[in-house]
Amino acid sequence: MVLMAPRTLLLLLSGALALTQTWARSHSMRYFYTTMSRPGAGEPRFISVGYVDDTQFVRFDSDDASPREEPRAPWMEREGPKYWDRNTQICKAQAQTERENLRIALRYYNQSEGGSHTMQVMYGCDVGPDGPFLRGYEQHAYDGKDYIALNEDLRSWTAADMAAQITKRKWEAARRAEQRRVYLEGEFVEWLRRYLENGKETLQRADPPKTHMTHHPISDHEATLRCWALGFYPAEITLTWQRDGEDQTQDTELVETRPAGDGTFQKWAAVVVPSGEEQRYTCHVQHEGLPEPLTLRWEPSSQPTVPIVGIVAGLVLLVAVVTGAVVAAVMWRKKSSDRKGGSYSQAASSNSAQGSDVSLTA
């Protein structure tokens, strides 16, 4: 695959910020690339989205009438025209690189160009509460399966199959892991710090959850107790059920945290209980926005109803988010540890706000 040339390192990114700014929690920045072939319908579509914590802040779609990287958060509108022009050019160049990667992957897997195929990339880093680098990561997938990933030490690669081994060998020869490590630990962190400062009113807030419990009879003998947490930010939250003080982890139905449509999140956890024993069960809620954990118990007299309108709105947005994620995020999950290792190719670092150019070509 074609390797992107290294770009000039970022010179100035609010240096004083790195020394003086502190945060109450860890933060992350991640970019997701998705490239999808569509035989007979033109060149593959390329989508790039960037997230700081749980907030999407930039997006690029090659299918737009006039493709440009665009802001997806109000605080990104502070960036001037030169920023968006530069990042748009980077996205367009990356789109061409990813399309070439897709063609090369077809050759590696001995596949024809008549079918639909997908190449996905996710990379980013986490920083601690006071700003230091915690960890970096980069994963690549082909047709929804692991292809190659940067190991935790940021010095080596794990390939998922024999085809990926080809990429791994080329990356090792090019010292690609070292390039990625330097980029993720340095320039990438500086961009994250800049965005955290510019968007601090949004990104560093802590909205506590609004909680309540609902009761849903199943039969004369059983009922479902559902513990709700609504309107919270950030997305990290813990809901646990206890019976007489003992955790009911195995018996708890827990949904993934969902966007509510207004920049906050929703979640619920449920247990099935014997009718008449509801008072023995308690729901415990932990979140950054709470001064201390909450404990909820079913109160028959309150009989709260589920806020259908708010939940439906959240589910509608969830559908949109999931749809976007299918084309813009890495959807594969790590398989069991006994999978064969493999390798995958990657690009040189970039000093742009887009993050780094990631080339899967080899």
UniProtKB/Swiss-Prot annotation:
<dbReference type="InterPro" id="IPR011161">
    <property type="entry name" value="MHC_I-like_Ag-recog"/>
</dbReference>
<feature type="transmembrane region" description="Helical">
    <location>
        <begin position="309"/>
        <end position="332"/>
    </location>
</feature>
<feature type="domain" description="Ig-like C1-type">
    <location>
        <begin position="209"/>
        <end position="297"/>
    </location>
</feature>
<feature type="disulfide bond">
    <location>
        <begin position="227"/>
        <end position="283"/>
    </location>
</feature>
<dbReference type="GO" id="GO:0035577">
    <property type="term" value="C:azurophil granule membrane"/>
</dbReference>
<dbReference type="InterPro" id="IPR011162">
    <property type="entry name" value="MHC_I/II-like_Ag-recog"/>
</dbReference>
<dbReference type="GO" id="GO:0012507">
    <property type="term" value="C:ER to Golgi transport vesicle membrane"/>
</dbReference>
<protein>
    <recommendedName>
        <fullName>Putative HLA class I histocompatibility antigen, alpha chain H</fullName>
    </recommendedName>
</protein>
<feature type="topological domain" description="Cytoplasmic">
    <location>
        <begin position="333"/>
        <end position="362"/>
    </location>
</feature>
<dbReference type="Pfam" id="PF07654">
    <property type="entry name" value="C1-set"/>
</dbReference>
<dbReference type="GO" id="GO:0005615">
    <property type="term" value="C:extracellular space"/>
</dbReference>
<dbReference type="InterPro" id="IPR036179">
    <property type="entry name" value="Ig-like_dom_sf"/>
</dbReference>
<dbReference type="Pfam" id="PF00129">
    <property type="entry name" value="MHC_I"/>
</dbReference>
<dbReference type="InterPro" id="IPR010579">
    <property type="entry name" value="MHC_I_a_C"/>
</dbReference>
<comment type="subunit">
    <text>Heterodimer of an alpha chain and a beta chain (beta-2-microglobulin).</text>
</comment>
<keyword id="KW-0325">Glycoprotein</keyword>
<dbReference type="GO" id="GO:0001916">
    <property type="term" value="P:positive regulation of T cell mediated cytotoxicity"/>
</dbReference>
<dbReference type="InterPro" id="IPR003597">
    <property type="entry name" value="Ig_C1-set"/>
</dbReference>
<dbReference type="GO" id="GO:0030881">
    <property type="term" value="F:beta-2-microglobulin binding"/>
</dbReference>
<keyword id="KW-1133">Transmembrane helix</keyword>
<dbReference type="InterPro" id="IPR007110">
    <property type="entry name" value="Ig-like_dom"/>
</dbReference>
<dbReference type="GO" id="GO:0000139">
    <property type="term" value="C:Golgi membrane"/>
</dbReference>
<feature type="glycosylation site" description="N-linked (GlcNAc...) asparagine">
    <location>
        <position position="110"/>
    </location>
</feature>
<dbReference type="GO" id="GO:0042605">
    <property type="term" value="F:peptide antigen binding"/>
</dbReference>
<dbReference type="InterPro" id="IPR003006">
    <property type="entry name" value="Ig/MHC_CS"/>
</dbReference>
<keyword id="KW-0812">Transmembrane</keyword>
<comment type="function">
    <text>Involved in the presentation of foreign antigens to the immune system.</text>
</comment>
<keyword id="KW-1003">Cell membrane</keyword>
<feature type="region of interest" description="Alpha-3">
    <location>
        <begin position="207"/>
        <end position="298"/>
    </location>
</feature>
<dbReference type="InterPro" id="IPR001039">
    <property type="entry name" value="MHC_I_a_a1/a2"/>
</dbReference>
<dbReference type="GO" id="GO:0030670">
    <property type="term" value="C:phagocytic vesicle membrane"/>
</dbReference>
<dbReference type="GO" id="GO:0005102">
    <property type="term" value="F:signaling receptor binding"/>
</dbReference>
<dbReference type="GO" id="GO:0002486">
    <property type="term" value="P:antigen processing and presentation of endogenous peptide antigen via MHC class I via ER pathway, TAP-independent"/>
</dbReference>
<dbReference type="GO" id="GO:0042612">
    <property type="term" value="C:MHC class I protein complex"/>
</dbReference>
<dbReference type="GO" id="GO:0006955">
    <property type="term" value="P:immune response"/>
</dbReference>
<dbReference type="GO" id="GO:0098553">
    <property type="term" value="C:lumenal side of endoplasmic reticulum membrane"/>
</dbReference>
<keyword id="KW-0490">MHC I</keyword>
<keyword id="KW-1015">Disulfide bond</keyword>
<feature type="topological domain" description="Extracellular">
    <location>
        <begin position="25"/>
        <end position="308"/>
    </location>
</feature>
<feature type="signal peptide">
    <location>
        <begin position="1"/>
        <end position="24"/>
    </location>
</feature>
<comment type="similarity">
    <text>Belongs to the MHC class I family.</text>
</comment>
<feature type="compositionally biased region" description="Low complexity">
    <location>
        <begin position="342"/>
        <end position="356"/>
    </location>
</feature>
